[in-house]
Regions:
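Bacterial N-terminal signal peptides
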Residues: 15-17
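Short, low-complexity, Lys/Arg-enriched N-terminal segments of secretory-pathway carbohydrate enzymes
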Residues: 1-2
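ER/Golgi luminal nucleotide-sugar-dependent glycosyltransferases, focusing on the catalytic module
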Residues: 5-10, 21-297
């Protein structure tokens, strides 16, 4: 009897030890996000709330920095979704917000605790369902030091700046911090792309940091335009893309696919996300059958 009890105790201890080892192995990285916003009317729109909630599912805290002012009553919307928020016109676009959010994390001790940081902005409706599968997939890419959702080859291969993730060895490097803190006001908005988005990837790559995108860019080579966001239905339906660029519903982004089919697919995928989008876009983009659903809501 004593031997059996001793054996049972040994098995229990071994099981607990194994469980603890597995738990340590799969421990979620501590992650903080900087979200860059812009509110010309001084309000927080529903799609932004959705985005912040999505980030909170994969991050331990979100810093919200807007390049605009905010009506005092609107700040209530941010209090339970952020660890810090700033709303001031700094005139450095999203990159100025990234800079300010990054430095707040640094000055308040969060970077010391962080394994990863996210830079994201409000140029997309996201997530369509959840960011979790994307982060689970990219966690397997142990070779990467930083990554983006999608890359572009215009000018040079680079991750697009509306969603980027950096591991500790990158964001703690003086080269990265120098680049971020060198962000300045530009006389034309296109310069934020050519000076910062286009240059960051090769700049970090030059120091030996490895990168890639969640969307398999080489596999997408059959889509002719280097801006793959011009094929939103393909990305969402075939590749599980969690983002829809807001510019799709303007004249500033060339689209090669049917937006009616896109909206119908989003409605089937996640009706609540569809309604977020429908409340923001011009009425004439919405197919008649979906207008009825919107009006009946």
């Amino acid at each position: 009897m004593f031997k059996q009890q001793k054996k049972l105790v040994f098995v229990i201890i071994a099981t607990i030890a194994l469980a603890m080892a597995v738990a340590c192995y799969i421990k979620k990285p501590k992650r903080y996000a900087v979200f860059a916003g812009y509110n010309p009317d001084g309000t927080i729109h529903p799609y932004v709330i959705t985005y912040l909630k999505g980030l909170n599912e994969v991050a331990d805290g979100v810093v919200y920095v807007a390049d605009s002012t905010l009506k005092p009553a609107e700040e209530e919307k941010l209090k339970n979704l952020t660890i810090h928020y700033e709303n001031i016109r700094h005139e450095e676009y999203d990159w100025g917000s990234y800079k300010r959010g990054f430095n707040w994390l640094k000055d308040n001790g969060y970077l010391e605790k962080a394994d990863e940081i996210i830079f994201a902005n409000d140029s997309c409706y996201a997530p369509l369902t959840s960011f979790k599968p994307m982060f689970k997939a990219m966690a397997k890419r142990k070779d990467l030091d930083f990554w983006g959702v999608l890359q572009n080859t215009r000018f040079n291969p680079h991750v697009q700046s509306y969603f980027m993730v950096f591991k500790k060895n990158v964001f703690s490097a003086r080269q990265f911090q120098h680049f971020i803190n060198a962000v300045r006001h530009q006389v034309d908005s296109s310069l934020y792309i050519t000076e910062y988005e286009v240059k960051l990837t090769p700049y970090l790559e030059n120091f030996g940091f490895k990168w890639d995108s969640y969307m398999p860019y080489q596999e997408l080579s059959y889509l002719a335009d280097s801006e793959k966001n011009s094929y939103p239905l393909t990305l969402v339906k075939k590749y599980g893309y969690q983002f829809i660029k807001r510019r799709i519903f303007t004249s500033s982004l060339l689209i090669y696919e049917d937006t009616d089919k896109l909206l119908r697919y989003v409605y089937e995928l996640n009706p609540e996300r569809y309604f977020d989008i429908a409340s923001e876009i011009p009425e004439w983009f919405i197919p008649d059958d979906l207008k009825e659903k919107k009006n009946a809501r």
